[in-house]
Amino acid sequence: TTEIYTLSLHDALPIYKEFEEFRRLFDSSLQSSNSLLSEVLSYIKQRNGKMMRPILALLIAKLFGEINDSTLHAALSLELLHTASLVHDDVVDESDKRRGQSSVNAIYNNKVSVLVGDYMLATSLKHSAMTREITIVDLVACLGQNLSEGEIIQLANINASEFSEEVYYDVIRKKTAALFTASAEAGAISVHASDEMVKNARLFGEMIGIAFQIKDDIFDYYSSDEIGKPTGNDMREGKLTLPALYVLNMFDDEEMRKLALRIRALDASDEDIARFIEYTKVKREIGRAHV
């Protein structure tokens, strides 16, 4: 009964057939005659995520018109760029886990990870050109710049003594939100939506992206195998997210501020991080971040 229900639900989705076509295109784009490259790309394919960004691009395109080849190549270009950025991020963050599984750099090494990420970036640009929409090509290029700039801002903030919510929002607008913004905008552009529709799609994508990142950051305060990352993982990488920033700015606790600075400097133990998480929970600032 469950299987029948699932199939009928899938068939009812407005972009089910187009998404299946996208998945085939995605899989075929991650192939190579080189054995090592093919092996790494296959591993990346096996652990891909929920693909919310291409789904958003397809839904927006369907809302304003009919999904076409330009839409599919735009969605693929953005998903490849997103995936490449994750491969590179794991190298920068020295992370050995991604989506609950071993990261590419943990299985292979940093050199292979960087080169495979570069290969995917080049493939992303290729598919942006296949949209035959110069606006989408420019969109993808600007997205790449934003992702890099967001990562640099985040790295530069590690040594900051202030706990700025403004910097936090600046980072997520240039990283997570930028991906959702570009996906929604590309979907609208691919079906030649009006300027007003493109503008609305862009704003909608940004709001979805910001909300998604805040929710993802909140997950870091709770343990769950389904989330795909251990509790306090962001803090182990020196990142203080919105709940932490709220509690640091709301309460004048010198001991916790010093601990937060040690977390940023990667000088905190697992026990320190667990203590800071518990402090944030007690102060109920996670609930404020939910709102």
Model-derived regions, located:
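All-alpha prenyltransferase/terpene-synthase fold signal
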Residues: 8-290
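Extracellular/surface recognition and adhesion modules
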Residues: 1-4, 291
